[in-house]
């Protein structure tokens, strides 16, 4: 609704400014129209900045304002205030159109075509098979999943990809520890998920290496060499441990409702990059050093490609082995061939900024794709109160245990409320997932997070359980209304004159704009904070207003339609944020 009004006003203002420019013989390259919310609601619903037009057209603000008002006509109430023209909407029409639109479009409300047919790949999660997922992975996963849903809501054709890192020295560390200390233990014998069992051996390796560093390093290199040569026993061990780890990781994905369209294993595709570099050498895009290594020159600061100071970057070592950047080049080629993407987004922590700047520059120079088609969506770290997590020391909050801990805390609270209620375990899990997902999304993604379990589970603050609770409360209101079995009547939206009702309507009507902004900025926190704003406003309204009034059924019908629109919008937010909707709490 608000988007339609803004587009209508923009067209009328554009027409007015062009006519004024033409009459003054002024050539305009671009007309930038600034619309914003007034600081106070009584000033209007939208403010248009006129001052810039005055400078360009060399006309007074009142003259320009009057011409715009003529063009707008009687459709909106207008009032000039200094450099601004304030607009007031027709409330009755606006309320009716907004509620009808939401309740008609339902789960599609908010969807738009701002990214229509744009082919986007999002690579996220990308775990190593030497440990379970921890809360840092959860932030990566929920950003990737949520952003995928937001981009889809804006019309993009999204492909979600997961590249599982299942080879290399870090994987060999768990393998070596298992060979030394495993005693043929299995997840079944240990009564542990496979990824947790493998993670234990990763920690054991680091304990062993701290006492035998040189020996351990030599053993790791020997094990890696044996794997690369296809040694049967080594490959069998690698296959067994990787399967345990991947099966365990997939269980966590299933619990957290994280899905992928395609899962790659690094071991299956890492050689593609070598071919890309050799082809680049043949085409003269890179060069061979005296020792046989194949290199390319990159700017010393890859965020400034005009910098003329270059340094050498090895793409293939003298012995023919590749580096991670080379493997990533191969992945870009493979995905370009398979999906012909318009853009590829990598959801990876901020510590990898330099790697991706270099990767994108080299991909461009080798003619693989324009570096502007490649995006590193950098996110901040998730820290414990004690500091940064380190999996090699076992100092992590692993995802499964975090979910379990929060579920147990929630169960204790639920048992106080529902002594005889069934399925409390499922309810506790869904509340816990809402708590975790919301907490990891509500902060702007580039910022670090200090994870606070108690705060994440709060039912009263800016939290996932609060959003879930407001949704459940509205559902309860609707159930109570439906049980009255009142006759169906046309809703009289003219009765919704409460200022709180108007504020809620305006928030609902802006949902599409929030999705567009979240898509453009690639920032799910915009939707998270929007959902809290809507939930908080409805909660205030509910406390101050009698929604079901048996003595005024006409008003009740109108307020119930409003409540339905709020619930649908909250449910749509929850879907975008991968937060479970709960009917009863």
From Swiss-Prot:
Q: How does the annotation summarize its subunit structure?
A: Monomer.
InterPro entries found in the cross-reference section: aa-tRNA-synth_I_CS, Arg-tRNA-ligase, Arg-tRNA-synth_N, Arg-tRNA-synth_N_sf, ArgRS_core, DALR_anticod-bd, Rossmann-like_a/b/a_fold, tRNAsynth_Ia_anticodon-bd
- The Enzyme Commission number assigned here is 6.1.1.19
Q: Which PANTHER family did the record assign?
A: ARGININE--TRNA LIGASE, CYTOPLASMIC, ARGINYL-TRNA SYNTHETASE
Q: Which GO terms describe its cellular component?
A: cytoplasm
Look up the record and give one Gene Ontology term from the biological process aspect. Answer: arginyl-tRNA aminoacylation
Family per similarity comment: Belongs to the class-I aminoacyl-tRNA synthetase family.
Tell me where the sequence motif 'HIGH' region sits in this chain.
127-137
Q: PROSITE patterns attached here?
A: AA_TRNA_LIGASE_I
The record's gene field reads argS
Q: Which reaction does it catalyse?
A: tRNA(Arg) + L-arginine + ATP = L-arginyl-tRNA(Arg) + AMP + diphosphate
Mainly localized where? cytoplasm
Q: What is the organism field in this record?
A: Borrelia recurrentis (strain A1)
Q: Where in the cell is it found?
A: Cytoplasm
Name the HAMAP family on file.
Arg_tRNA_synth
Recorded protein name is Arginine--tRNA ligase
Membrane-spanning parts: none
Q: Which UniProt keywords apply?
A: Aminoacyl-tRNA synthetase, ATP-binding, Cytoplasm, Ligase, Nucleotide-binding, Protein biosynthesis
MF-aspect GO terms: arginine-tRNA ligase activity; ATP binding
């Amino acid at each position: 609704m608000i988007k339609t009004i803004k587009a209508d006003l923009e067209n009328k203002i554009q027409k007015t400014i062009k006519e004024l420019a033409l009459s003054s013989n002024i050539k305009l390259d671009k007309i930038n129209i600034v619309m914003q919310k007034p600081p106070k609601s009584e000033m209007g619903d939208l403010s248009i900045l006129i001052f810039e037009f005055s400078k360009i057209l060399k006309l007074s603000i009142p003259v320009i304002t009057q011409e715009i008002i003529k063009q707008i006509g009687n459709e909106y109430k207008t009032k000039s205030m200094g450099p601004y023209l304030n607009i007031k909407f027709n409330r009755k029409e606006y309320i009716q159109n907004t509620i009808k639109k939401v309740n008609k479009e339902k789960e599609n409300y908010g969807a738009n075509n701002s990214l229509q047919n744009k082919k986007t790949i999002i690579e996220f999660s990308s775990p190593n098979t030497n440990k379970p997922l921890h809360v840092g992975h959860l932030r990566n996963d929920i950003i990737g999943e949520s952003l995928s849903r937001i981009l889809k809501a804006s019309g993009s054709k999204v492909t979600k990809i997961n590249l599982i890192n299942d080879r290399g020295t870090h994987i060999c560390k768990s393998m070596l520890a298992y060979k030394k200390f495993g005693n043929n233990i299995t997840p079944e014998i240990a009564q542990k998920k496979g990824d947790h069992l493998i993670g234990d051996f990763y920690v054991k390796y680091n304990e062993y290496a701290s006492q035998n560093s040189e020996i351990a390093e030599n053993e790791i290199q020997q094990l890696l060499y044996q794997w690369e040569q296809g040694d049967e026993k080594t490959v069998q061990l690698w296959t067994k441990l990787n399967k345990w780890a991947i099966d365990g990781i997939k269980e966590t994905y299933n619990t957290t409702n994280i899905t992928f369209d395609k899962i790659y294993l690094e071991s299956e595709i890492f050689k593609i990059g070598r071919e890309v570099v050799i082809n680049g050498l043949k085409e003269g895009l890179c060069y061979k050093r005296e020792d046989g290594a194949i290199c390319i020159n990159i700017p010393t600061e890859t965020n400034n490609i005009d910098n003329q100071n270059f340094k050498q970057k090895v793409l293939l070592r003298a012995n023919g082995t590749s580096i991670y950047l080379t493997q990533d080049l191969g992945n870009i080629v493979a995905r370009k061939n398979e999906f012909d993407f318009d853009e590829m987004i990598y959801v990876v922590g901020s510590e990898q900024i330099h790697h991706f700047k270099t990767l994108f520059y080299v991909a461009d120079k080798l003619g693989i794709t324009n570096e502007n088609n490649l995006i590193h969506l950098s996110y901040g770290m998730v820290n414990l109160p004690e500091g940064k997590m380190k999996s090699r020391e076992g100092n992590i909050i692993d995802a499964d245990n975090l979910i379990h801990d929060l579920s147990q805390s929630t169960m204790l609270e639920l048992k106080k409320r529902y002594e005889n209620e069934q399925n409390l375990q499922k309810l506790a899990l869904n509340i816990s997932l809402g708590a975790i997902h919301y907490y990891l999304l509500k902060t702007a993604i580039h910022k670090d997070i200090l994870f606070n379990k108690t705060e994440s589970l709060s039912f009263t603050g800016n939290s996932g359980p609060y959003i879930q609770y407001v949704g459940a409360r509205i559902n309860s209101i609707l159930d109570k209304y439906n049980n009255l079995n009142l006759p169906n009547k046309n809703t009289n939206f003219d009765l919704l004159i409460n200022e709180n009702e108007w504020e809620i309507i305006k928030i609902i009507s802006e949902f599409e704009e929030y999705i567009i902004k979240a898509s453009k900025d690639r920032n799910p926190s915009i939707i998270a904070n929007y959902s809290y704003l809507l939930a908080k406003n409805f909660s205030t309204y509910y406390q101050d207003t009698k929604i079901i009034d048996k003595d005024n059924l006409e008003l009740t019908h109108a307020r119930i339609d409003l409540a339905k629109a709020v619930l649908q919008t909250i449910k749509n937010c929850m879907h975008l944020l991968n937060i479970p909707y709960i009917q009863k709490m």
